[in-house]
């Protein structure tokens, strides 16, 4: 009887261990681990502040609030923006995203987040992207010369 009880306990422990591993794998998938273009899919609101540094003259402050739609396939478009450059406000109309693209890669070790790049057009502006595994927020920094400009894009809808 003792032997039967021991075998039953061992079998139960093994079964629980196996189901725990299966659940961990399932949870990992739910968190969106692993980076791909589809990590960014939906409408985001981007808000950033910083400065542009002209070739001559002092640095000028700039800020933007912009709608960005990531299509989950490496393409994106802007649904419009408001920009302030040295206190001059401009409304920027929506664009169809022609020439706009982004790329994404896993950080090392995988599962810790993603890193990517974004180009609004062939001539810029260009950004480096830092993305948590679920892609709900994106930290962005402009990489064009003579710019000190960074902000966050937050997912607002799919």
What are these regions (language model features)?
Residues 11-17:
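Bacterial N-terminal signal peptides
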Residues 23-158:
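Mature soluble binding/inhibitory domains
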Residues 1-10:
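Bacterial N-terminal signal peptides that target proteins for export
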């Amino acid at each position: 009887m003792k032997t039967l009880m021991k075998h039953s306990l061992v079998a139960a422990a093994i079964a629980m261990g196996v189901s725990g591993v299966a659940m961990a794998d399932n949870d990992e998938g739910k968190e969106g681990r692993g980076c791909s273009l589809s990590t960014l899919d939906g409408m985001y609101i981007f808000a950033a502040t910083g400065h542009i540094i002209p070739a001559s003259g002092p640095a000028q402050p700039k800020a933007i609030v912009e709608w960005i739609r990531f299509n989950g396939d490496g393409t994106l478009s802007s649904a419009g923006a408001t920009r302030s450059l040295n206190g001059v406000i401009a409304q920027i109309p929506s664009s169809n995203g022609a020439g706009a693209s982004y790329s994404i890669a896993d950080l090392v070790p995988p599962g810790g987040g993603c890193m990517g790049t974004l180009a609004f057009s062939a001539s810029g502006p260009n950004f480096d992207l830092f993305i948590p595994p679920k892609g709900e927020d994106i930290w962005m920094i402009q990489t064009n010369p003579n710019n000190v400009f960074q902000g966050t894009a937050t997912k607002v809808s799919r």
